[in-house]
Amino acid sequence: MARYVFITGGVVSSLGKGLASAALGALLQARGFSVRLRKLDPYLNVDPGTMSPFEHGEVFVTDDGAETDLDLGHYERFTGVSARKTDSVSSGRIYSNVLEKERRGDYLGKTIQVIPHVTNEIKDFLRVGEDEVDFMLCEIGGTVGDIEGLPFFEAIRQFAQDKPRGQCIFVHLTLLPYVSASGELKTKPTQHSVKELRSIGIAPDVLLLRSERAIPEKEREKIALFCNVRKEAVIAAYDLKTIYEAPLAYHREGLDQAVLDAFGISPAPKPNLDRWVDVMDRLENAEGEVRVAIVGKYTQLEDAYKSIAEALTHGGMANRTRVRAEWINAELFEREDPSPFLEGFHAILVPGGFGERGTEGKIRAAQYAREKAIPYLGICLGMQMAVIEAARNLAQVKDAGSEEFDHEVGKKRFTPVVYHLKEWIQGNHIVERKHDDDKGGTMRLGAYTAALTPGSRVSEIYHATEIEERHRHRYEVDVRYREALEGCGLTFSGMSPDGRLPEIVEIKDHPWFIGVQFHPELKSKPFAPHPLFADFVRAAVEVSRLV
């Protein structure tokens, strides 16, 4: 039976609950325990799949096709444990499930209420898989006091009450602000946050204090006294240069020991943190630097491409090189020469995205990389842009484009070399889609197998002829243009097992030019960099040595 750790936040949002949860999971793993991490989000969207990246950041996709919060990416990167659909839930999903049950008559005519029906649905979610691991770490989104979060706080209060004593603990993350006028760290916001938490029946066992300044011993003692928490369980959470320092930093502060003490686990197994020491060594002792241009649409918010930024960092670790990723808005050169914007970069990456805005700039970026022999990695839409560029400028399909950008019914602006995907094979059955389907959850989602051409660059990078990668798309390159494009040098080196869906394209007569329909960044880890990103950065290093 799993022990449960509930991670909550107070004072302000975006303090780093997800990273704290991931770091704690990594520390418990380092002591020999098995873990699983979960995220409970109070928003009413069923999932983040239809939310704007500017609202929510990136959507992290699991192997089994769930569209989830980006925090699940942190969980996977820090622990190596693949997330599942059952590791993410929102108020929207909970209420949807409850209302479906009501319509079916499952509640036998009873009046449906937040308590007990909604809270019971949340508790049922928490119980899934509780026999599989030693620790279940559950992060509650938002902050204590948010009205939309109240059913979740009530549910975890009940859940802990239902479990045997010592089976559940609560970790609360708050802000310790520094007031420059008085030269002091202020503890009052933390005291009020804990007071709010206790008012709904939850007493924190461990406090994490986010601070940009060293926390004096007297302030820790004060917080311990007023918040009724052991002094040893008042843990500093300082600002760090890199998120990958978090496991070592939290261990130095005693977080993992405080959690084990709260559970009464003694003596605790000693941690083996060698791989995190190696990660930090590779980051801090990089032997060079490469500049990578990320030509995208959502460049104002780095969280929109969070996994890509982290995967590039991992690729740098694999090559003991610092990767300086620079975000460039593709709209800047939709109608002009991209050279002034892209000169001086050692590699170019065009990530996934939706909609027509900025696509001509991405196509120009792919052309620049192809003609200037600059390493190019196109992901999802980035692969489609590379194919459209090759179709226009090499295969002489001058009006090549995507069905995604032909908005007017009956009026075609482009010859669609990229089309709306209407059916594909998933497991042993065929999935069918129509243009007028709902937007949410209707894409080709999750892990799919691809067959690689023996002797191709990608087969050499993967050291395999069959791979499995995660997808999130509803448009696909039209395989009918394969012969024309391959005749111009753009090879289709990865295909779906049935040979119908192009998964990877590459240019042989180029230092490094690869487009992939899937999202390799979602499977990269600091201690296991994704092979595509590792080799992409290696190619950038080669270019940097020629400059």
Swiss-Prot record:
Enzyme Commission no: 6.3.4.2
Binding sites annotated in the UniProt record for Mg(2+): D71, E139
* Catalysed reactions, as listed in the record: UTP + L-glutamine + ATP + H2O = CTP + L-glutamate + ADP + phosphate + 2 H(+); L-glutamine + H2O = L-glutamate + NH4(+); UTP + NH4(+) + ATP = CTP + ADP + phosphate + 2 H(+)
Q: Which Pfam families match?
A: CTP_synth_N (PF06418), GATase (PF00117)
Which GO terms fall under biological process for this protein?
Answer: 'de novo' CTP biosynthetic process; pyrimidine nucleobase biosynthetic process
Arranged from A to Z, the UniProt key words for this protein are:
ATP-binding, Glutamine amidotransferase, Ligase, Magnesium, Metal-binding, Nucleotide-binding, Pyrimidine biosynthesis
Q: How does this chain assemble?
A: Homotetramer.
Q: What does this protein do?
A: Catalyzes the ATP-dependent amination of UTP to CTP with either L-glutamine or ammonia as the source of nitrogen. Regulates intracellular CTP levels through interactions with the four ribonucleotide triphosphates.
- According to its UniProt record, which protein family does this protein belong to? Belongs to the CTP synthase family.
Q: What is this protein called?
A: CTP synthase
Organism equals Cereibacter sphaeroides (strain ATCC 17023 / DSM 158 / JCM 6121 / CCUG 31486 / LMG 2827 / NBRC 12203 / NCIMB 8253 / ATH 2.4.1.)
Gene (name only): pyrG
